[in-house]
């Protein structure tokens, strides 16, 4: 029986970058790794309504730099920057080192797999019919320039006694093409009938060298490092 490899993991170092980038010796590695998980868990809980796409963590010179990609930057920053300063202090307390917190806006949340999966999960928890939720997300993504999208939901759909899997696809989603920029994410909807899993694949275009042929939807350009010469960095 054929199985699918993780679309993000197979492209690491080719067209995708790691979400944590830092170097540590054997003594400090486990502490830094644990701190990364704590910081991410804290931010995902604290910013559950801010439509967070991903969190990038870097550790330059005994400090930590956290970049949060969100579709609602104003909700995180708060009035006169009060909320972001509280977040920065909490992250510094968790990590125990000086902290720099950056907020980056996701300009096209309709092309972000994480935000799309969370959107479908939210609709299912509000008892929206799953087919309607899937079709709405697919149509919005294709309208805003996606080359292809696939959405899959599995579980006790509409309260059925037997769990099943249903999917909907439009356009191209070439999972075997490593130069294809495939954004993949997984989310869960906690309904009264149990947990429903949601998987989303978004094909944004092809990457030739360091040039992405379709806008990724982020406000800042993300450089793609195809070189394997930087051995002094530990990527997670």
UniProtKB/Swiss-Prot annotation:
Protein keywords: Ribonucleoprotein, Ribosomal protein, RNA-binding, rRNA-binding
Ranges of residues in domain KH type-2: 39-107
Signal peptide (from-to): none
SMART domains per record: KH
Any single biological process term in GO: translation
The organism's place on the tree of life at top rank: Bacteria
Gene3D superfamilies in UniProt: 3.30.300.20, Ribosomal protein S3, C-terminal domain
InterPro entries per the UniProt record, alphabetical: KH_dom, KH_dom-like_a/b, KH_dom_type_2, KH_sf_prok-type, Ribosomal_S3_C_sf, Ribosomal_uS3_bac-typ, Ribosomal_uS3_C, Ribosomal_uS3_CS
Gene Ontology CC terms, in alphabetical order: cytosolic small ribosomal subunit
Gene Ontology molecular function: mRNA binding; rRNA binding; structural constituent of ribosome
Summary of subunit composition and partner proteins: Part of the 30S ribosomal subunit. Forms a tight complex with proteins S10 and S14.
Similarity comment text for this entry: Belongs to the universal ribosomal protein uS3 family.
Function, in words: Binds the lower part of the 30S subunit head. Binds mRNA in the 70S ribosome, positioning it for translation.
Full protein name: Small ribosomal subunit protein uS3
Organism in which the protein naturally occurs: Blochmanniella pennsylvanica (strain BPEN)
Gene: rpsC
């Amino acid at each position: 029986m054929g199985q699918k490899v993780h679309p993000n993991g197979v492209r690491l170092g080719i067209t995708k970058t790691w979400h944590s980038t830092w170097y540590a010796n054997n003594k400090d590695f486990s502490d830094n790794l644990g701190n990364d998980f704590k910081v991410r868990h804290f931010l995902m809980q604290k910013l559950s309504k801010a439509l967070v796409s991903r969190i990038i963590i870097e550790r330059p010179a005994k400090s930590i730099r956290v970049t949060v990609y969100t579709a609602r930057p104003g909700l995180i920053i708060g009035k006169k920057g009060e909320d972001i300063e509280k977040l920065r202090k909490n992250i510094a307390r968790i990590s125990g080192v000086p902290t720099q917190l950056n907020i980056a806006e996701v300009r096209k949340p309709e092309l972000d797999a994480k935000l799309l999966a969370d959107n479908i999960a939210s609709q299912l928890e509000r008892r929206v019919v799953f087919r309607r939720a899937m079709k709405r997300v697919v149509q919005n993504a294709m309208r805003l320039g996606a080359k292809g999208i696939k959405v899959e939901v599995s579980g006790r759909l509409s309260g059925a006694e037997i769990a099943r899997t249903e999917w909907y696809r439009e356009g191209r989603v070439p999972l075997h093409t490593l130069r294809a920029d495939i954004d993949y994410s997984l989310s869960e909807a906690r309904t009264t009938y149990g947990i429903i899993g949601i998987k989303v694949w978004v094909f944004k275009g092809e990457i030739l060298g360091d040039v992405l042929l379709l806008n990724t939807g982020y406000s800042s350009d993300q450089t793609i490092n195809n070189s394997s010469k930087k051995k002094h960095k530990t990527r997670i």
